[in-house]
């Protein structure tokens, strides 16, 4: 009986030591309701320039997200410049605040309307060759790792209403609709 008790105590001590030196890694798997693919179409003012975003964002359970969208800039009533964007980053939710960090962004100009004249992507290629300069893209003006904060105002399963905290002007709302 004494030998059995010593064996149990020895095994318990061994398990305790192993647990101390080899702790279980924290679970990085997220289960928030935002996981999935969402569509949105919204616009906001950044100090005189109207920005419009129309696209999809996919949030994954590993805390990563991807965004694919058309992003248009309208600095005045006669000019609109549209870019196709593809970005990737990380997301986290704290209480009712969604925080995203954009780690990588690629964009390409797809269309420009100036005083009724439409320039398409092939026209941009020609402009680059003629000017011997690359046309500026959104990532030329965006800091890598830039973060954005959103207040979750409505948290329904298929529709989310976010208030974007806009450091360059008034806050604005974004409605997201679940695609899958």
Q: Which ranges hold each PLM region?
A:
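Lipid interaction determinants
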Residues: 2-86, 94, 99-180
């Amino acid at each position: 009986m004494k030998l059995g008790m010593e064996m149990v105590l020895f095994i318990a001590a061994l398990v305790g030591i192993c647990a101390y030196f080899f702790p279980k890694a924290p679970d990085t798997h997220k289960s928030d309701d935002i996981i999935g693919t969402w569509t949105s179409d919204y616009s906001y003012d950044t100090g005189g320039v109207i920005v419009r975003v129309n696209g999809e964002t996919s949030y994954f359970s590993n805390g990563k997200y991807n965004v694919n969208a058309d992003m248009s800039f309208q600095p005045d009533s006669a000019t609109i410049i549209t870019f196709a964007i593809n970005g990737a980053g990380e997301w986290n939710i704290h209480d009712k605040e969604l925080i995203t960090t954009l780690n990588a962004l690629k964009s390409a100009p797809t269309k420009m309307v100036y005083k009724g004249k439409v320039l398409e992507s092939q026209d941009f290629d020609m402009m680059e060759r003629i000017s011997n300069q690359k046309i500026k893209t959104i990532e030329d003006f965006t800091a890598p790792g830039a973060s954005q904060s959103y207040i979750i105002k409505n948290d329904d399963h298929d529709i989310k209403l976010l208030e974007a905290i806009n450091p360059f002007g008034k806050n604005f709302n974004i409605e997201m609709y679940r695609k899958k």
